[in-house]
Design a protein with these regions (language model features):
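Generic recognition of flexible, low-complexity loop/linker segments
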Residues: 1, 279-280
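Bacterial N-terminal signal peptides that target proteins for export
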Residues: 19-31
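Bacterial N-terminal signal peptides
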Residues: 29-40
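Metallo-beta-lactamase
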Residues: 41-169, 177, 196-199, 218-222, ...
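Intrinsic disorder/low-complexity segments, especially N-terminal tails and targeting/processing regions
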Residues: 12, 30, 43-44
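N-terminal amphipathic/basic-hydrophobic helices that include classical n-h-c signal peptides
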Residues: 1-21
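Active-site-proximal loop/helix segments of hydrolase catalytic cores
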Residues: 169-242, 253-259
Length: 297
């Protein structure tokens, strides 16, 4: 086709064809520009997504999507060290070097301060209002102004979240014997492929909503005093339903361990340790649910 020269008369059909070509070019340019802008916007919005719980995802996945044994899926698992300190306090040391202290009250002194402390407010033996200011992460199991606590945070290689529970009113204006809704928390720590739960100063049975919010637990720390928290029958029922591979007793006082073992049933083995620290990975979880009693419990 010969290009039209200046001054030539352009036939109407040719003029229309030129117009359509220009419009198509504009449409392509506009689509390209929009696609480029979209590529800039999507990553920014993706960064605003909430933290994801792997333990909840595994618990809610369809049966066929869940591996028979999670500990067989990793080529090399990382160890987590769990040390019994006293009462309801365990230290959890992660592969990334984060130290967590559960139900921290400030009474147990070690050479290294924890990086994270969790607290429950049932008694002063489970919290402190004056933690060392050098502890960077202080997580309360109770909220302000009667509201539930909402914990969902990542510290180093560990993701920490909570499940609110109710608490009996003990002292002062709260000494009514009634339950204070959402006054305490179960804390869950997700690290190195393990789901670790600390039931805290639990005062009541858990319903389906609680179990759904907890999700999968590989290791659970349970109070077995049978008095200040809840009955041995009640905590045994909860322990069985959680179906954790490892059960770590705490808050025992003078309760005979055999009484707890008799109630939770013969499907649990018992492993009494001479040391106070359990070093464990998802690969080394016991095949049979086991109550591990660390030195000092």
């Amino acid at each position: 086709m010969t290009a039209a020269k200046f001054g030539d008369t352009v036939p109407p059909a040719a003029f229309a064809a030129m117009g359509h070509a220009m419009l198509r070019s504009l449409n392509v340019s506009l689509a390209t520009a929009l696609a480029f802008l979209g590529s800039l916007i999507v990553p920014a919005s993706a960064q605003q997504q909430p933290l994801r719980s792997e333990c909840l995802a595994m618990a809610s996945a369809p049966p066929l999507a869940v591996p028979v044994s999670l500990r067989r899926t990793a080529a090399k698992a990382e160890d987590v060290a769990i040390t019994y300190v006293g009462h309801s306090t365990y230290y959890i040391d992660t592969p990334g070097g984060v130290r967590i202290a559960t139900d921290f009250n400030g009474a147990y002194r070690t050479e290294r301060l924890p990086d994270v402390i969790t607290m429950n407010r049932a008694h002063s033996t489970h919290y402190t209002l004056f933690p060392d200011p050098k502890i960077p992460h202080v997580l309360h199991g109770w909220g302000e102004n009667g509201q539930a606590a909402h914990v969902s945070t990542r510290v180093g290689d560990v993701y920490i979240r909570n499940v609110p529970t109710d608490i009996r009113r003990y002292y002062g204006e709260d000494a009514s014997g009634a339950m204070l809704k959402d006054g305490n928390s179960i804390f869950i720590f997700e690290v190195a492929g393990l789901c670790i739960g600390h039931l805290g100063h639990l005062h009541h049975k858990l319903d389906d909503t609680h179990f759904a919010a907890i999700g999968r637990l590989d290791i659970v720390m349970v109070p077995i005093d049978g008095t200040y928290t809840m009955s041995l029958d009640g905590i045994s029922d909860i322990t069985r339903r959680l179906r954790a591979s490892v059960v770590l007793p705490m808050h025992r006082f003078m309760t005979p361990l055999d009484e707890f073992m008799r109630r939770i049933g013969q499907q649990f083995e018992i492993d009494r340790r001479g040391e106070g620290t359990l070093t464990i990975s998802r690969e080394s979880l016991p095949a049979t649910p086991t109550v591990i009693i660390l030195n000092g419990v």
